Amino acid sequence: MNANETDTRYNLWHKLLGKIFEELLTPVNIMVKTGFPVMAGSPEADVLLIRRNQQRWTEAQRNLLPDGIRDTQADHVLIEFKYSESVNQNVLFQALSYRHLYLKVKKLKPERLHTVIISSKTPSKQFTDGFRLSGERQAWSMAQ
């Protein structure tokens, strides 16, 4: 498979995920964007959900949103989708970079953006053992 075919397949998976979210969530007033640039000339984030016209997710929206998203109070949700690889340090740093850039470009406070990684494969035990859940905000940190 050449690079162009790989790129096309990659984009199709992201468009498919975005379309699923769009079909489910647009009727309940959530804007869905795919291939969303986090800043001019940069790589594109995979999927962005933006809650519109209300302070919290409505019950109808919560019923359609997946675990890990429905309970957030953030009105912007950045989704990094890995259809063929598991979560690893590079994927984590990529998602965090997109998050940082999006916050800067949109001039948002961090609590307004929730970042999620969706992966088709379970992370390796070595990776998960190298990170631990800590603190009352349940943030992941690298084990020392």
Regions found by a protein language model. Name each.
Residues 1-144:
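Elongated, amphipathic alpha-helical interaction scaffolds
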